[in-house]
Amino acid sequence: MRFFARMKRISLIALIAVLVSCSTNADRPAPPAAVTPDADAVRAAVQHTFDGLATHDSTMLAAVILPDANFQRWGADSTGTWRTVNLRGGAFTSRLGQPGPAYLERTWEADVRVDGDVAVFSAPYDFWVEQTCSHCGYDAITLVRSGAVESDFRGWRIASLTYTVDASGEDACRERFAGMPASPFPAE
């Protein structure tokens, strides 16, 4: 009996210690996104991807996207059921590097974490097609340093990109993401 009473007491003390440490950490603001040459290069690699999308330039896209990168799109279908679509980096590059409508992808409030030769870029985004907000969501991009370090993005290349898609329209996107920038296109 004494053994169980002692174990209860130890468990209670451990639980209190965990709760105190959690509540103490909850009061602290999250650390700011890193501002280092590598973090800036990661941001440059992501922006390079968006610039390649905007110009439908498969060479630009291939410079920053690994051929075997995994792209995963999460969004609701017409019935409201969440579905995923998977695509390899080479297929993404060749598909979106073809002539087509004008694209613009923007992110804001990006968080960049770098650990050696691996980095994570995460941020809300909006995606515009022909001056209309097509959808918005959240980008989670993993990059690895595997290219030429002399490049504008210091060798950082995209290894995976997982993103959510909310195609409910611009108003719904603005409601969902309070920090969404104003439309990049003049009102008609």
Where are these regions (language model features)?
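Bacterial N-terminal signal peptides that target proteins for export
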Residues: 2-12
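Bacterial N-terminal signal peptides
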Residues: 11-21
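Short, low-complexity N-terminal intrinsically disordered segments enriched in polar/charged residues
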Residues: 22-67, 176-181, 185-188
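Short beta-strand edge/turn micro-motifs at domain boundaries
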Residues: 25, 120, 136-175
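N-terminal, post-signal-peptide region of Sec/Tat-exported proteins
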Residues: 56-90
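A mature extracytoplasmic/lumenal domain signature
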Residues: 65-67, 75, 123-127, 141-142, ...
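Surface-exposed, charged secondary-structure patches
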Residues: 70, 83-134, 183-187
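A short local loop/turn or secondary-structure capping micro-motif enriched for an aromatic residue
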Residues: 80-81, 129-131, 165-170
